[in-house]
Amino acid sequence: MSLLPSRAARVPGPSSSLCALLALLLLTPPGPLVSAGPVAAAVRELRCMCLTVTPGIHPKMISSLQVFAVGPQCSKVEVVPTLKNKKEVCLDPEAPLIKKFIQKTLDSGNKKN
């Protein structure tokens, strides 16, 4: 019996099954991430959308308005209108004109129902 290792002893390094798994992961296309489409657009990132705010926009330039409440992704209310030229901007939710516009929008929505 010899104390020297035999030639068939394992050489330290990644195992063949680990290499096969890594190769499989690298060759697998990220299907759900690519094919998510509109669903992925609806999911917000885990950060505030509005890093800077625009002080005000004339209400006639706004085609739609989204108001995002405080949540785990952001500690402040975010007001994001889509303008008629399809651009999205962030408005200051504390501005008096914006508060008035949001209230008017909510009131007109209640009258329609």
UniProtKB/Swiss-Prot annotation:
GO terms for molecular function: chemokine activity; CXCR chemokine receptor binding; heparin binding. Chemotactic for neutrophil granulocytes. Signals through binding and activation of its receptors (CXCR1 and CXCR2). In addition to its chemotactic and angiogenic properties, it has strong antibacterial activity against Gram-positive and Gram-negative bacteria (90-fold-higher when compared to CXCL5 and CXCL7). Coiled coil: none annotated. This is C-X-C motif chemokine 6. Keywords: Antibiotic, Antimicrobial, Chemotaxis, Cytokine, Disulfide bond, Heparin-binding, Secreted, Signal. Belongs to the intercrine alpha (chemokine CxC) family. The gene is CXCL6. Its main location: secreted. It comes from Equus caballus. Disulfide bonds join 48-74, 50-90. It is found in: Secreted. Residues 1-36 form the signal peptide. One of its GO terms (cellular component) is extracellular space. It comes from the Eukaryota. The lineage of its organism: Eukaryota, Metazoa, Chordata, Craniata, Vertebrata. The keyword Electron transport does not apply. The keyword Transport does not apply. GO terms for biological process: antimicrobial humoral immune response mediated by antimicrobial peptide; cellular response to lipopolysaccharide; defense response to bacterium; inflammatory response; neutrophil chemotaxis. Gene3D superfamilies: 2.40.50.40.
